[in-house]
Curated annotation (Swiss-Prot):
GO annotation, biological process: protein folding
Residue spans of biased composition, Basic and acidic residues class: 243-309
Signal peptide range: none
Record's compositionally biased regions (Basic residues): 223-242, 329-338
Protein name (Swiss-Prot/TrEMBL): Peptidyl-prolyl cis-trans isomerase cyp11
Organism, as annotated: Rhizopus delemar (strain RA 99-880 / ATCC MYA-4621 / FGSC 9543 / NRRL 43880)
Residue segments, region Disordered: 186-338
A molecular function (GO) term: cyclosporin A binding
Xref: SUPFAM superfamilies: Cyclophilin-like (SSF50891)
Length: 338
């Protein structure tokens, strides 16, 4: 748990002397710490008892004893006789587990047991005689030099400062991590995870080769089982869809569908039989018969084209031409070559 932090901006007679940053022990005294935090922010509005803003802003340190403490928080009377908590007039003591064993501690002021309001004090030395009587709820984490300056302010015979030592501004500080802090944390976590993974891999690699082979075989078996299960699941889904569609249909529609399926199956059977018979007849025929049938099936145009392609065209010879010579009985006709 991260404890909240608040701040006081201190002015002496209107002159800013610095800022005090305070950590509240919300993990040990949450009720007391919440009272102080809310009075620093002023978020609770007007008090039910005093009808005044529940806010430390503008209040003064009305009592300062050098070598002991600086007391403030009376925003109702500004004399040490007033004050109001966010819970009402006062609230009980929460815990005395923290001791007044050092300087810079924040403790609740009271008029006896269970009379805490809004008044508090900051110690400037260890004060063990206050243990068990006042609740310690915070500590100064920065700006203790400002507390020392307040401690050295002149006071009258009633320990009231001669100058106006006022809380000019106060509030809660929001924890903001630096830009690279989150990345560093994430990288640290990732590095740890990578180290763990590497250690696991090393431990696995240190095992026998036989165990690794067995593992690989088992993995392959699992994969094959998964593939088979997927195939079966697809088939089951299709069957379920068919069954669901059949259930949704009326009995007459189911009969009609079954008839159509029977007709389709009969047509398929007849087609298959015809194909088989035609194949058998083709096997019985000679190749010349097949060629003749193929030629018959062709159109006359295709036949003429086949003939033209098969026989090259030759120019006719003019027998009246004196250059044409006939050899033999007249079958071999040729033109003389020069």
């Amino acid at each position: 748990m991260i404890n909240p932090r608040v701040f006081f901006d201190i002015d002496v007679d209107g002159n800013r002397i610095g800022r005090i940053v305070i950590e509240l022990f919300a993990d040990q005294v949450p009720k007391t710490a919440e009272n102080f935090r809310a009075l620093c922010t002023g978020e609770k509005g007007i008090g039910k008892v005093s009808n005044m803003p529940l806010h430390y802003k503008g209040s003064i340190f009305h009592r300062i004893i050098k070598g002991f403490m600086c007391q403030g928080g009376d925003f109702t009377h500004r004399t040490g006789k007033g004050g109001e908590s966010i819970y009402g007039a006062n609230f009980p003591d929460e815990s005395f587990s923290r001791k007044h064993d050092t300087h810079g501690l924040l403790s609740m002021a009271n008029r006896g047991p269970n009379t805490q309001t809004s008044q508090f004090f900051i110690t400037t030395r260890p004060t063990p005689h206050l243990d068990g009587k006042h609740v310690v709820f915070g500590r100064v984490v920065s700006g203790y030099n400002v507390v020392e300056m307040m401690e050295n302010e002149p006071v009258d015979d009633q320990d009231r400062p001669l100058h106006n030592v006022m809380i000019a501004n106060c509030g809660e500080l929001v924890l903001k991590l630096p830009p690279g802090a989150l990345l560093k944390k994430a990288s640290a976590v990732s590095d740890e995870s990578e180290d763990e993974i590497k250690n696991r891999k090393r431990s696995r690699s240190s095992d026998d080769d036989s165990s690794s082979d067995e593992d690989s075989e088992e993995e392959e078996r699992k994969r094959t089982k998964k593939k088979r299960s997927r195939k079966h699941s697809k088939k089951d889904k299709k069957k379920k869809k068919r069954e669901s569609s059949n259930r949704k249909r009326s009995p007459e529609a189911n009969r009609h569908v079954s008839r159509e399926r029977r007709d389709i199956s009969r047509e398929k059977r007849d087609n298959s039989r015809e194909r088989r018979l035609s194949r058998k007849e083709d096997d019985r025929r000679s190749p010349s018969d097949k060629r003749k049938e193929d030629r018959r099936s062709l159109s006359p145009e295709k036949r003429s084209s086949e003939r033209r392609v098969a026989r090259p065209v030759r120019p006719r010879l003019n027998y009246n031409d004196p250059n044409v010579e006939v050899k033999g009985r007249g079958r071999f006709k040729y033109r003389p070559t020069y």
